[in-house]
Amino acid sequence: KHAVTCRIIDWRRVEHSSEAAGRYFTVRHNDMEKDTAFQMSASNIRYGQGTTSELGMDLDDMQLRRTLVVMDPALISLPVGERVLESLKANAVDFDLFSEVSVEPTDSSFQRAAEVAIEGDYDSFVAVGGGSTIDTAKAANLYSTYPADFFDYVNAPIGKGKPIPGPLKPLIAIPTTAGTGSETTGVAIFDYVEKHAKTGIAHRYLKPLLGIIDPDNTLTLPPAVAAATGLDVLSHALESYTAIPFTDRPRPDRPIERPAYQGTNPISDIWAIRALEMVRDYLPRAVADTSDDEARGQMLLAAAIAGIGFGNAGVHLPHGMSYPVAGRVKDFHPAGYDVDHALVPHGISVILNTPAVVRFTAPADPGRHLRAAQALGAETEGVPGEDAGEILADQVIHFMKTLEMPNGLAAVGYQQEDVPALVEGTLPQHRVTKLSPIEAGPEELTRLFTDALTIW
């Protein structure tokens, strides 16, 4: 071993500039705590009708012989479930089927999946369903590969936020909703029931090895579910495009400590804007006519595209505020969801906060908010920067009305007296709220939730 001594003579840092042309490349010689790098990570993606039938061949080619299939129970007897199981059998892949998946996963449902995975000693995982199913498979993969106390890997401050020690076993994700983009991200979200809080695990090692995006798998998606999940796509893209720039984030001591959610960067911006444009063009069509194959397929692809963007840049206040909205639900029962308990679907819980948030964050970068509004179809030529928040909020509301979303938090059961509890539930969501371009403490969150009670 050799001892190496190095003296840094001139360490140049990158500073965020409000000028579009110099957003990422204005250089200065101080502010040493800021990062100068970002890292893009993404799952392999395969898109096309009929690609589900290739699953068994993929596992065979990787010489994987014992897999745990995590599947939404509603899909087992539907064509997508049948195609998955037939493909595995045709390629002599030994598998077990786990279907104890919650519509909104909890700490206990994650732990149950992990127990099954540990007992089965699997060499691979397959997830078939929406984001809840894929996230459950991620958790099963993690805890069976690196067993630990459940909260060791859970995001701080609810958990210890320990980094995942190394790569996981191969996970192939087959999404059946056009929403979460979980097939591309290193995030697994769950409800911590005891605290009425939503939190998760975030690390790039959680990303699936492959996402198989097959438009045939959304044929049976109810219109109301397509609307809610589609607005989640909108939120992912919008928040990742309006988050802090990566140069405003503290520099980690080691590269492995660089978070999955790093802030906006020149590459994630491309994915975010394209996803917003696809939502503009295809979401209303996909909801209005479930037989519109082009619109359904393009929304499924948009979910993955947005996932690649926000899976590296991150989301911020609308998602952070959504977690207590979903976790503290009282008696709201949404159309299209076959559940026997109260539920505010994730996409709805996010979009209800979005108009208030974009009005709040627009002063941080009016041009960026106007560009997002333009991608969603707004006319922005000649619009002054001070109107950026209102223009973007109006465009989001346009989609909410078109897709018949509830008119604010009051429409899903919350009142002014609930706001303090919603604020309390948002404050621990540091992983995402710290990416807001304007800091939101208790006072700001109180105003935002109050504004979100009734939207129009």
Language-model-detected regions and their locations in the chain:
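An N-terminal, well-structured beta->alpha segment
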Residues: 6, 11, 19, 23-98
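A glycine/threonine-rich phosphate-anchoring loop and its flanking beta-alpha core
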Residues: 146-260, 364, 371, 375
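Active-site segments that bind and position negatively charged phosphate/pyrophosphate groups
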Residues: 247-390
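A glycine- and small-aliphatic-rich helix-loop capping segment at beta-alpha/alpha-beta transitions
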Residues: 86-90, 114-120, 139-156, 186-196, ...
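Conserved beta-strand elements of the Class I
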Residues: 68-69, 124-126, 172
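N-terminal small/polar loop signature for handling phosphorylated ligands or for N-terminal nucleophile
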Residues: 76-150, 284-296
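C-terminal charged capping/lid subdomain of soluble metabolic enzymes
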Residues: 28-30, 369-456
